[in-house]
Amino acid sequence: MKNVKNDTADCKVKIIPLGGLEQIGMNMTAIEYGDSIIVMDCGLAFPSDDMLGIDLVIPDVTYLKDNYEKVKGFVITHGHEDHIGALPYVLKMVNAPVYATKLTMGLIDHKLEENNMLRSVKRKVVKHGQSINLGCFRVEFIKMNHSIEDAAALAVFTPAGIIL
């Protein structure tokens, strides 16, 4: 029997929180496996009282800029500012397709239009129960309740297993 090396044998799933931990706002998490990265949400935070002159705060996306060629897309769970507010700023640095449900995409479109970016960003509306393929990932949008309509949980199927 021949020893066959599996190209993904040394690969591990990396879950990289870029914002949203130990704070309210800036929700953004990258999931990486091999040569593929997807980004879940892209939110902003509002400045604290001691941040004079600052209008908003966005996540540090240096890792995404450094690995730009791996970023397959942004998958968005819902339309609250802490989940979509940073998109116009981040997409200027890492322009990858955006996937979201209909209402969420409508809110995103409004933000992109305000920033004169509607034509430069690829967007796709995804229905609840529908899956999309991004690099080595398959992402299923699952209907869930939240304080805003059209919210989705995301099931991320990776070569190593499912992240829910």
Feature names for model-found ranges:
Residues 103-151, 158-159:
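Metallo-beta-lactamase
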Residues 15, 31, 41, 78-79, ...:
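Divalent metal-coordination and catalytic microenvironments
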Residues 83:
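N-terminal Rossmann-fold NAD(P) dinucleotide-binding loop
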Residues 5, 30-35, 39, 151-164:
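Metal-dependent phosphodiesterase/nuclease catalytic metal-binding core
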Residues 21-26, 33-76, 88-96, 100, ...:
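Pre-active-site segment of Zn-dependent metallo-hydrolases
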Residues 1-6, 23:
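C-terminal regulatory/interaction regions
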Residues 9, 21-25, 145-150:
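A short catalytic or substrate-binding loop motif that flags glycine-/basic-rich loops and adjacent residues
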Residues 11-14, 37:
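Extreme N-terminal starter segment of soluble prokaryotic enzymes
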